[in-house]
Amino acid sequence: MQAEIICTGSELLLGYVQNTNADYLGHELAALGIEVVLQITVGDDWKIMEQAVREALERVDLVITTGGLGPTTDDITKDVIAAVLGVPMVTDDESLAQMREYFARRGIEMPDIFIRQASFPYGSRIIPNHKGTAPGALIERDGKVIVIFPGPPRELRAMFETWVKPYLLEIPGRGEVLRTRVLKLTGIAEYAVQEILKELGDLVNPSLGYLAMPGEVHLRVNAHAVDPAEAERMVEELTEKVTGLVGEYVFAIDDEVPEKTVGDLLLRKGLTVSVAESCTAGMVAARFTDVPGSSRYFIGGVVAYDNDLKREVLGVPAEILDRYGAVSEQTAVAMAEGIRRLTGSDLGLAITGIAGPDGGTRAKPVGLVYVALASARETLCQRLLLPGVRKAVRIGTVNSSLRIVKSFLNRQA
């Protein structure tokens, strides 16, 4: 089964709004075994939109539109589809009543302009919208299916999961399903990951996809099969081989939030942590405290850019700074032990490095970072050489720091 996605809205064409709906729908449809052959974006132009819908219905079995369901005159998606199908627009009384109730719950009388949101092409099956005011619709016509979604991603996703996905699962002949696992790596460049994984040979199905982002590389493991269980097995098998080669760089899998994973481990083990940061300037502390309830295990942090602060607050000996410099294993270790001593936390995490673009030398290049972790029993330190510009180095340092803490906690009894 093939599908086409038509995203509407001049704000998308002008770049004012990021089109996350197409990404979401493409991924979800592929997982159902539905091939998306084309995704286009059109503005609020009747003639262009009408042409796009007509051509899509000639090409594919499933046409999905997003956006253009609002109450204003430039919201024309349903009217265009009605014209293409040659059917009138009709008001759905139940949708209208639900919309009036939506406004009533907020103590507002529904403006008349919203009435048009309850009008649909004749023959539509209404898709309720419990997250907003604009319902969607599903139309079956001559062996084709048209699904009409509102534009806000929060509304679209809820409607897809609740109503459209179950409908699509009942359609026979959807083809092979796609199963995916995303490994998120840090501390290594995209080309270096590809070089390491060359020994796996030429992969077709399952396959690997690469996406470089600031401070991390997303490695996508994909597999297609008619049987979902077989696709899962193929993904698991290749994932195991991949992690055997680059597992030391993996800091998260799929939608895992590493700071939450680390926080859960700290809570489970009854431990606390504090942070001393130089080149990341509070970014690690911010990630820890992005998690609600992190005060149960995160004590606090110190941003110590200046060497005087490293000495006076963290207790880094002057002789260490003079002999080895601020960016060194010795300084990182002293910072980690110092923040642990200062705050009374069980673990002390410290970061010092050269984020660039200036400050690097042949001996200490831009991207050189030391991450130290101190506990009552030992102090560990890792030397990192991170690729990219300043932003990438700092994000990579944060991700690597969380990976180091996670690895340490997983080794503890």
Swiss-Prot record:
<dbReference type="InterPro" id="IPR041424">
    <property type="entry name" value="CinA_KH"/>
</dbReference>
<dbReference type="InterPro" id="IPR036425">
    <property type="entry name" value="MoaB/Mog-like_dom_sf"/>
</dbReference>
<dbReference type="Pfam" id="PF02464">
    <property type="entry name" value="CinA"/>
</dbReference>
<dbReference type="InterPro" id="IPR036653">
    <property type="entry name" value="CinA-like_C"/>
</dbReference>
<dbReference type="InterPro" id="IPR008136">
    <property type="entry name" value="CinA_C"/>
</dbReference>
<dbReference type="Pfam" id="PF18146">
    <property type="entry name" value="CinA_KH"/>
</dbReference>
<comment type="similarity">
    <text>Belongs to the CinA family.</text>
</comment>
<dbReference type="InterPro" id="IPR008135">
    <property type="entry name" value="Competence-induced_CinA"/>
</dbReference>
<protein>
    <recommendedName>
        <fullName>Putative competence-damage inducible protein</fullName>
    </recommendedName>
</protein>
<dbReference type="Pfam" id="PF00994">
    <property type="entry name" value="MoCF_biosynth"/>
</dbReference>
<dbReference type="InterPro" id="IPR050101">
    <property type="entry name" value="CinA"/>
</dbReference>
<dbReference type="InterPro" id="IPR001453">
    <property type="entry name" value="MoaB/Mog_dom"/>
</dbReference>
